[in-house]
Amino acid sequence: MDDNLQLADGGFTKNVARSGRRARQSAEMMSAEDSRQRRSSSSISTAAEGPPPKPTRRQGGWAEESSTTTNVRSGRRAAAEEPEDRRLRPQTPEGSDNESGEDIPVIPDLEEVQEEDLTMQIAAPPSVQVNRVMTYRDLDNDLMKFSAFQTLDGEIDLKLLTKVLAPEQEVREEDVGWDWDHLEVSSELQSEWDEGDREDQSPLPVCV
């Protein structure tokens, strides 16, 4: 029949074109079948090509993270220990020969060290200069012998004072021993004398 469709090279072709309502219905049916055929052909082609490649899995977890963190920490520790190791290493001055034995300290033997006997040593007393204080006797002798002391600051004449100065024998008083009885009697006498002085100083009555 003329209405049959022929498949050629994966497509549909019409032998005869019709007009009218039946022709429109047949055209719609042909377009629907054409779309179905295309879908089926596309699915067949994709199946022939093979399944798409699977996405690569991301391998990781706590084990990998711990390994990376340990590597980072070990690197930091090594970087921090480097300057400390440099400080602890013995540093030799530049230009010195390490092979020579001059840099090696020599420890003396105990026999060579002389033991000092501190028991027989006596410390020297400190030498302190003390200014001697002049006594009254020295001052009196100076006043009597030297006329330079008869003036004060070169302006005040002290001759009148030196003339009336009494000798030491006349001024000195003998030491008298006191006990509690003497002290009580002296305090009573002193109180009586004070009362008598007050009575004498009291004003006399005025007669009107």
Curated annotation (Swiss-Prot):
Q: Tell me which domain of life the UniProt entry assigns to the organism this sequence originates from.
A: Eukaryota
The subunit structure is: Component of the IFT complex A (IFT-A) complex.
What this chain does, per the entry, is described as:
As a component of IFT complex A (IFT-A), a complex required for retrograde ciliary transport and entry into cilia of G protein-coupled receptors (GPCRs), it is involved in ciliogenesis. Involved in retrograde ciliary transport along microtubules from the ciliary tip to the base.
GO BP annotations, alphabetical order: cilium assembly; intraciliary retrograde transport
Q: Which family does it belong to?
A: Belongs to the IFT43 family.
Query: Under what name is this protein listed?
Result: Intraflagellar transport protein 43 homolog
Is this entry keyworded Cytoplasm?
Answer: yes
Basic and acidic residues biased stretches: 78-88
| Protein's cellular compartments | Cytoplasm, Cytoskeleton; Cell projection, Cilium
Ordered alphabetically, the record's keywords are: Cell projection, Cilium biogenesis/degradation, Cytoplasm, Cytoskeleton
User: Is-annotated flag, keyword Transferase?
Assistant: no
Q: List the record's Gene Ontology CC terms alphabetically.
A: cilium; cytoplasm; cytoskeleton; intraciliary transport particle A
**Ranges where the record places region Disordered:** 1-105, 187-208
InterPro entries tied to this protein: IFT43
Name the Pfam families on file: IFT43
